[in-house]
Structures are given as C-alpha cells and as structure tokens.
C-alpha cells in the first residue's frame, strides 16, 4: 500500500515538476519572478482566479500582471484607487472583477505594510495544531477593514461547513466560531 502511494506520488512529482508542464500551467506566473513578495502576490492572485481551463486562467493572470507591471510587490506598495479609474469597467476573470482586484491590492498593501511576507500570517501560533486557524487569521486580516465587501466570496472561511468548493471531504473545526 505505501509502495503504491510512493510510486504514485513520485510519478506525479516527475510529471508536474517538469518545464513542459509549467509552460501550460498557471504556476508559470510565479516562475517569472525572484523576489519573494512578487512571487507571493502573483501566486495569490493567480490562485484566487484558478477556476476554469488553464489557458483562460493564464490569460487572466497575464491581464493582472500587465496592469501591475514588472514588479507586483512594487505596484501593490504604491497602489492607489486612481490607478484603475481609466479601467473602470474592465473584467478580470469570471466573477473576479476590477473592483475585486482593486480591493485585493488594497488589502495586500495593508498586509505588506505590517508584514515582510504573507508567510507571517500563515505561521502556526502557540497552541495551534493545524492550519485552519492560520487560514482563518489570514482571511480576517485580509478583510479587517471591510468584511462585507463583495470580494469575500473569493477567499473561503475554514470555519464554515464547506470551506472549499474543490475539496470533497472537508469538515469544520469543532467548536470554532465563524
């Protein structure tokens, strides 16, 4: 049983950790950057819109990257709402609108003003035994100034019964408040 699992995982690692796979996959967006914060930002934004076919996701991620220029981190840190005034009605990807994109950039700006990396929000704190708390902490931090914003639909809560539409068997934390 363990040998079968190991063989399967080795096969999948070889399949996915190959330059030919990366070229047709949204993960290619991350491989364009070296700065940790650039990688985090484009990775987070690309993952947020990662539903549908890969070509469509890549095209939409390219659209966001064109708006941000060569450094997503620099753009986030210097972003103002006026940067998007001329693009008001532009759609990004399916239900992820320019309004959502602008909200995400503002939220990321606030996070990076207080943290060197998104990683800081995902580290387990003392007494935590799983990542449910860290994921919910990230979500709460992300929406701390406007929790009713329409963009909250793009970041699931781990404290809700169905925290991820792609997961088949997800259960909430026992006794967690949500």
Predicted regions and their residues:
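HhH-family (HhH-GPD) DNA N-glycosylase catalytic core used in base-excision repair
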Residues: 1-178
């Amino acid at each position: 049983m363990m040998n079968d699992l190991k063989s399967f995982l080795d096969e999948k690692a070889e399949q996915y950790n190959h330059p030919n796979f990366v070229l047709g996959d949204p993960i290619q967006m991350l491989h364009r950057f070296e700065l940790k914060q650039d990688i985090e930002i484009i990775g987070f934004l690309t993952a947020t819109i990662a539903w549908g076919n890969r070509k469509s996701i890549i095209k939409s991620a390219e659209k966001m990257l064109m708006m941000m220029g060569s450094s997503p981190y620099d753009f986030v840190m210097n972003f103002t709402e006026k940067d998007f005034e001329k693009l008001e009605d532009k759609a990004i990807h399916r239900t992820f609108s320019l309004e959502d994109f602008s909200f995400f950039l503002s939220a990321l700006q606030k996070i990076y003003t207080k943290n060197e990396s998104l990683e800081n929000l995902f580290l387990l704190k003392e007494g935590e035994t799983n990542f449910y708390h860290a994921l919910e902490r990230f979500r709460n931090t992300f929406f701390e100034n406007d929790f009713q914003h329409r963009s909250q639909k793009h970041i699931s809560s781990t404290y809700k019964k169905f925290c991820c539409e792609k997961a088949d068997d997800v259960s909430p934390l026992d006794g967690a408040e949500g």
